[in-house]
């Protein structure tokens, strides 16, 4: 039986001098021990997800904790059967979380170490979910929400996190005087976003400490009131959260049946994320529209080595056709 792989999710807001140099040093160490993953390092802190066997991940955690700046860094640990990443990336960025404010090119003046929302543990957050007078706001991207979310949480009419501040400004009159609690995957986005909400004048702002990942592992709440699965930015794509009464909320793009399997549209110029069963992926050659299904650079066709005749037959079976110039 192969050894389990550990996936580490973590972040910390802390001042890092010479962050660009530290990023290079960090990458060198990660590669030297065979770690895989993706890490962002900025002047304001560090944010990463990495994976490896027990020995490798333990070496990494010990090395990180040996730096006094990260001595108390909180690693959230999952156990999996296979690697969550194929390569190792460490990138220097201006920020580990960018709010995309029009009046502020960078968000360095929003320092979570100085201004942030009240930390709520899983039990307190569950109580907030059950409180009719509390507004629960999902701060993630739309495709993350669609895979899974807390019951009753607001889904902002946005595509990505950078659009959220403007959405809040446009809708602040609806919940300015109410208690607002926010959540995200591991907590890093909420640290900064809840601080921004406080700066905007919201009087009572809370955040799920440790994010959804921590809520799902809490022995008392066990992920209850979470519907669906949690989206993660690695090869796993999704992980279960609700261990009490799990449900599937996402629906197959093609037939509307329950489905948690995310794929990217095979048209490289579209790349839209859609839910699709293996059967429907095959049937629709992973294209989200007739144009994408017949696109000359359809990746599903290329990956599966379909001949032009096989491709045309797939499309004919669903009432579509392949233009003469495509695949000729």
From Swiss-Prot:
Residue stretches making up the Rhodanese domain: 130-224
Protein name listed in UniProt: tRNA uridine(34) hydroxylase
Source species: Streptococcus pyogenes serotype M3 (strain ATCC BAA-595 / MGAS315)
Transmembrane segments: none
Keyword entries, A-Z: Oxidoreductase, tRNA processing
Reactions it catalyzes: uridine(34) in tRNA + AH2 + O2 = 5-hydroxyuridine(34) in tRNA + A + H2O
GO molecular function: oxidoreductase activity, acting on paired donors, with incorporation or reduction of molecular oxygen
Classification via InterPro entries: Rhodanese-like_dom, Rhodanese-like_dom_sf, Rhodanese_C, TrhO, TRHO_N
UniProt record similarity statement: Belongs to the TrhO family.
Name of the gene: trhO
């Amino acid at each position: 039986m192969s050894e389990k792989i550990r996936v580490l999710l973590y972040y910390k807001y802390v001042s890092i001098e010479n962050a660009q140099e530290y990023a290079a040093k960090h990458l060198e160490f990660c590669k030297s021990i065979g770690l895989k993953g993706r890490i962002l390092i900025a002047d304001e802190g560090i944010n990463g997800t990495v994976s490896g066997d027990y020995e490798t991940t333990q070496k990494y955690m010990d090395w990180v904790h040996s730096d006094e700046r990260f001595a108390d860094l909180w690693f959230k640990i999952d156990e999996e059967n296979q690697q969550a990443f194929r390569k190792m990336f460490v990138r220097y960025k201006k920020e580990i979380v960018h709010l995309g404010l029009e009046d502020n090119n960078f968000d360095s003046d929003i320092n979570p170490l100085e201004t942030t929302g009240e930390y709520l543990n899983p039990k307190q957050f569950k109580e907030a979910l059950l409180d009719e007078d509390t507004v629960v706001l999902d701060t993630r991207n739309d495709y993350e929400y669609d895979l899974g979310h807390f019951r009753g949480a607001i889904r902002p009419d946005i595509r990505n996190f950078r659009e959220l501040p403007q959405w809040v400004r446009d809708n602040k009159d609806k919940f300015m005087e109410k208690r607002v609690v926010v959540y995200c995957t591991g907590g890093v986005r909420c640290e900064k976003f809840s601080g921004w909400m406080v700066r905007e004048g919201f009087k009572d702002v809370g955040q799920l400490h440790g994010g959804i990942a921590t809520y799902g592992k809490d022995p008392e709440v066990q992920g209850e009131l979470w519907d669906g699965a949690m989206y993660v930015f690695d090869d796993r794509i999704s992980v279960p959260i609700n261990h009490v009464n799990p449900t599937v909320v996402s629906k197959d793009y093609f037939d509307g049946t329950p489905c948690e399997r995310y794929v990217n549209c095979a048209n490289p110029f579209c790349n839209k994320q859609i839910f699709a069963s293996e059967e429907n992926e095959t049937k629709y050659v992973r294209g989200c529209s007739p144009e994408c299904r017949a696109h000359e650079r359809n990746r599903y066709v290329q990956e599966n080595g379909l001949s032009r005749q096989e491709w045309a037959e797939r499309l004919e079976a669903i009432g579509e056709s392949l233009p003469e110039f495509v695949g000729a």
